[in-house]
Amino acid sequence: MKLLILTCLVVLAVARPMVEKISESEEHVTDVPENEHRLEINRYLRPEYEMMNLYYQPFYWSEEMRNLKMTSLPKDRRMAVLKSVVSDDMLPPLQHKSLSLPKPKVLPLSHRQILPPHTLRMVPLSHKLFTIPKREMLPISERERLPAHERENLLAHEREILLAPQREMSLIPEREILLAAERVVLPEQEREIRPDNEREVLAVHKREILPASEKEKVLPLFQERVLPLHRREIVPPYQRDTIARREILPVDQRELMPEVVAVDLYPFFQPVANFYYPAELNEKN
C-alpha cells in the first residue's frame, strides 16, 4: 500500500511540469492568433460607432455639424442655403415693380354694324381692326363676289388670297370630283370606243342633260359589245332599269362563286344501343 502511494506521488511530481508547459503553450497559441485576426479585421472594417455614423449622419457634414442636433442649428447655417448667388444689384428693377399693361379698348358695335354670327367668328381682335383692310375681314366666299374691275385694284397678297381656292380646284381633274359610280371612261379604255360614240366619253351628268331624242342615238356600251366586268359601273342610271341587277353591280368575289342551292334538312336518327339490356330487347323495342 505504501509502495502504491509512493509511485503515485512520483508520477505526479514528474507530470506536473509537463502539464504546466502544455498549458502555457496553449495560452500562447490561443492569444496570438486572436490578436492577429482582430488586426486583419480592423484593416477592412471600421469601428462600430463609425459604421453607425455612416447611416445616421451624412458624410459631407463637418465636425461641428455632427455634434449639433437638427433642432438647434445656428441661424446662419440654416439660412445659408436660401441666400441667392446673384447680388441684388444684378437683378433687374422689374421684380420690385408691378407690371402695368394698358387694357385693350373694346369698341362696342352700333346697331347698323351688327354682323351675322358666321361673320363675327372671322372678325379679328378689336385692336387689329384699324390695321387690316376691310376686304380681308370678309370671308373668302364673299370676297370672290367682287367684280373684275375691283379685283384688279387689289394688292398682290390680297389677290393671292382671293385666287388661292380657285388655283387649288384647278389642280383636281374633273373625273376625280365625280362619284365612284359616275366617273368618266379612263384614258386606256377610250381607245376601245369608236369615234362615232364620242358622247359616251362625256361624264354621266353631262350625258343625262341631253334631250331624249339624242339620248336614243347614243348607243349604250352594253349594247355595242359585251361589257367587261370592270366597266359595268359606267352604265348611266336611266339605262339601268333595262339591265339585270346582277350586271349593274360591281365585280365582287361573290359573283364568281356558284349559287347555293337550298337543301331541306331532314332528321337522321341513329339506332340506340342500351348498355343494360341485351341486343334482343333493343331489336324488339
From Swiss-Prot:
Tissue expression, as annotated, is:
Mammary gland specific. Secreted in milk.
Q: Does the keyword Secreted apply?
A: yes
Coiled-coil stretches, from where to where?
none
Q: How is it modified after translation?
A: Phosphorylated.
Q: Which residues carry this modification: Phosphoserine?
A: S23, S25
Record key words, sorted = Milk protein, Phosphoprotein, Secreted, Signal
Give the transmembrane ranges: none
State a GO cellular component annotated for this protein. Answer: extracellular region
Annotated signal peptide: 1-15
Localization per record? Secreted
Q: Does the keyword Phosphoprotein apply?
A: yes
Similarity comment: family membership: Belongs to the beta-casein family.
Q: What does this protein do?
A: Important role in determination of the surface properties of the casein micelles.
Mind telling me what this protein is named? Beta-casein
What is the originating organism of this protein? Answer: Trichosurus vulpecula (Brush-tailed possum)
Taxonomy of origin reads: Eukaryota, Metazoa, Chordata, Craniata, Vertebrata
